[in-house]
C-alpha cells in the first residue's frame, strides 16, 4: 500500500497572546511539491525502513525520519493493541525542519498506512492524536486531510495554557475555521537554502518561551489583515491582494520573530524575489524555506532565485497549491 502526501507552507501563527481565551491559530497553504511517497507492508518480525536515494539524504534528515517513523509505528501499534512488524519504503522525501511540515506529514502517513492495512480508517485529526501532532498549528493535519488554503482556530487556554510548538505540545489538533481552494493558476516558487542550524527541539521551545506572549496590538493587526484582506483575496482569486497580505504579515507578531531569527541571506532573498516581481514573498514557519507567489512571471522569478542561489547550497522548487489531501494507492 502506498501513500502520497503533500507538504505545506505555514504562513503565520495568529494569536500568541491569549487575551480572549484562545492561543495559537494558524494560516497555511497545502502544496503539491515537494511531497512524501511511502510504501508499507506488514508481516515482518521487526520494523524495516528502506530509503530510496538515501545517498542524497543528509544524516540529520535520515536520523529524523527514522525516529519519527519508528515512533509512529510504536504509537499506532499500541493504539491497535498489536505488535506487528512493518517494512516502510521511503520513495520520495524532503528535508526535515525546513519549514515544510515533514514531521507531521511523515507521522500521519505512517500511521494512516498501518491503520488502513489493519482495516481501520480514521480521520486525520484522530490519527494526529495517536502520533502526537497538531498540538499548536492545525495546518499540517488539515493539509493531510483536505488540502487547500487553511485557517485554524487555535486552542482554548483552559486546555493549553502554555505557549509551545507542536512538537512539544500534547494538545489535540485545533478546529478548522476556514478552508478554500487556491486558484490553479497561482504558482509557488520555493527557495530552500541549506541551513547549518535549524530551529527544532529545545531551541524551538525556548523561542516560544522567550518571545511570548506577543503584544495584543500585533495580534489585532494580524487578524485584521487576515480577515479583511488575505481570506477575501483567496475567495475572489485576487493574487495581488493576497500577495500584499503575505508581504504585510512578515513584519507582524510571531512571524516577525521568526523572520528576525533568520540569517541575513534569507531576508536578502525575500527582498530580491519581491523586486523580481513576485506578488508576495514569505518565510514558511521558522524557515529556511522562502516562498514566492506569482502567476505570469514565474520564469523571471525562478531566474532571479537561481542567480541568488548560484554560490549557495540548496534547492529551488516550482510548485502549486494542492486542493486535496493525501492519496492512498492500494
Where are these regions (language model features)?
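Short beta-strand-to-loop capping motifs
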Residues: 40-42, 53, 193, 292-296
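Short Gly/Ser/Thr- and Asp/Glu-enriched loop/turn motifs at secondary-structure junctions
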Residues: 6, 85, 145, 283-288
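ATP-binding N-lobe of GHMP and related small-molecule kinases
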Residues: 1-98, 115-124, 323-324, 329-330
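Glycine/serine-rich anion-binding loops at beta->alpha junctions
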Residues: 91-116, 136-144, 281-285
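ATP-dependent small-molecule kinase catalytic core of the GHMP/sugar-kinase superfamily
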Residues: 2, 12-14, 18-23, 123-276, ...
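Small/polar glycine-rich anion-binding or flexible loop at a beta-alpha turn
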Residues: 263-266, 284-291
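Extended, folded domain segments that form the structural surfaces/walls around functional sites
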Residues: 70-71, 75, 105-120, 291-295, ...
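Short, flexible, solvent-exposed loop/turn segments with mixed acidic/basic and small polar residues
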Residues: 39, 180, 277-284
Amino acid at each position: 500500500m502506498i501513500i502520497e502526501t503533500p507538504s505545506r507552507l505555514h504562513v503565520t501563527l495568529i494569536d500568541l497572546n491569549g487575551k480572549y481565551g484562545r492561543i495559537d491559530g494558524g494560516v497555511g497553504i497545502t502544496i503539491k511539491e515537494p511531497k512524501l511517497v511511502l510504501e508499507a507492508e506488514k508481516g515482518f518480525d521487526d520494523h524495516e525502513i528502506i530509503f530510496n536515494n538515501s545517498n542524497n539524504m543528509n544524516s540529520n534528515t535520515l536520523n529524523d525520519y527514522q525516529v519519527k517513523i519508528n515512533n509512529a509505528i510504536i504509537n499506532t501499534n499500541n493504539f491497535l493493541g498489536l505488535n506487528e512488524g512493518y517494512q516502510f519504503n521511503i520513495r520520495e522525501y524532503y528535508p526535515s525542519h525546513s519549514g515544510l511540515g515533514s514531521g507531521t506529514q511523515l507521522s500521519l502517513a505512517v500511521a494512516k498506512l498501518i491503520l488502513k492495512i489493519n482495516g481501520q480508517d480514521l480521520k486525520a485529526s484522530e490519527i494526529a492524536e495517536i502520533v502526537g501532532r497538531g498540538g499548536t498549528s492545525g495546518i499540517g493535519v488539515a493539509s493531510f486531510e483536505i488540502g487547500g488554503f487553511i485557517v485554524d482556530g487555535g486552542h482554548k487556554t483552559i486546555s493549553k495554557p502554555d505557549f509551545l510548538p507542536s512538537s512539544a505540545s500534547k494538545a489535540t489538533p485545533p478546529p478548522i475555521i476556514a478552508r478554500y481552494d487556491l486558484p490553479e493558476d497561482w504558482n509557488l516558487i520555493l527557495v530552500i537554502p541549506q541551513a547549518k542550524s535549524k530551529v527544532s527541539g529545545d531551541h524551538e521551545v525556548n523561542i516560544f518561551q522567550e518571545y511570548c506572549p506577543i503584544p495584543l496590538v500585533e495580534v489585532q493587526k494580524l487578524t485584521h489583515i487576515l480577515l479583511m484582506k488575505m481570506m477575501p483575496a483567496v475567495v475572489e482569486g485576487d493574487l495581488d491582494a493576497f500577495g500584499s497580505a503575505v508581504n504585510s504579515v512578515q513584519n507582524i507578531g510571531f512571524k516577525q520573530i521568526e523572520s528576525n531569527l533568520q540569517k541575513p541571506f534569507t531576508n536578502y532573498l525575500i527582498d530580491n524575489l519581491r523586486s523580481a516581481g513576485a506578488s508576495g514573498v514569505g518565510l514558511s514557519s521558522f524557515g529556511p524555506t522562502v516562498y514566492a507567489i506569482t502567476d505570469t512571471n514565474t520564469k523571471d522569478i525562478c531566474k532571479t532565485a537561481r542567480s541568488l542561489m548560484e554560490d549557495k547550497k540548496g534547492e529551488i522548487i516550482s510548485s502549486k497549491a494542492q486542493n486535496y489531501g493525501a492519496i492512498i494507492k492500494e
